[in-house]
């Protein structure tokens, strides 16, 4: 069977940096209900490790006022229903996905794409984003399409796993992966501090990648899934009348740390963590990265790329780990071993061992 490679990755974000505006909107909302929680929110914001996040929504000049955004999508005390949120997804998702694919500069490879895999947990429609991309990017109409929906942050690793098996079974396959998330469409107005932390963390973004047997980029070696028992309620993502409801327990970092520590030999195929040169860890938040660092006893610099992506973009769900992989590939390291991982509902860690092409 052929070796399988991520040949290249490209990324795109919307034009609006909303981190400061979301922070001000959430802080003012909490202050009205509970000034003490508002002060705690500010301290947590200062320690989040995030400086920028991007959204398809245009922020208003005064997010402390009646509307967060210029279009009135988030009006104080009148947040949108699910149908309105999905209308915005249908409007903005195809354009952002196309931008990421175009940055791959496929050229002649465009006509050679055999498979298309799309991941998203932030919106749905039919005909969907897969067919939008075929039309917008002029892909072959015969392309085989798969949509991996509603898996959350670890969907990109599952998409890579699927592409890996496709190429191993069809050596001539050329698989286009698109990870598109518009997380900022699903914020909730709530006086609960834990719920309002989503205003500090989530963002919009898209990654596109090409996977094939061509020996360039990074080689995909193996995959492991680690399910932590009795953690089903710690991360949940449910469709409700007023949008998609997120539960993200404060226990998640500690559970991730314990689960990774117990499963380290399985994840790393018996290799010591010190032998892994490159770490592509989904930056689900600063405390999540801290938990991974402690679980594998990593050097403080080991997760520098993940921390930089968190600082520049926040958590873009399934797209985020691909932003990390793109930056590691761009660094030009060759012949080095790596480990990628993402976390999500279950609680599950989806992991992948890779190596840079010689």
Language-model features and meaning:
Residues 1-3, 110-114, 141-144, 170-175, ...:
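Short coil/turn connectors at secondary-structure junctions
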Residues 83-88, 118, 145-149, 194-196, ...:
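A short glycine/serine-rich beta->alpha loop
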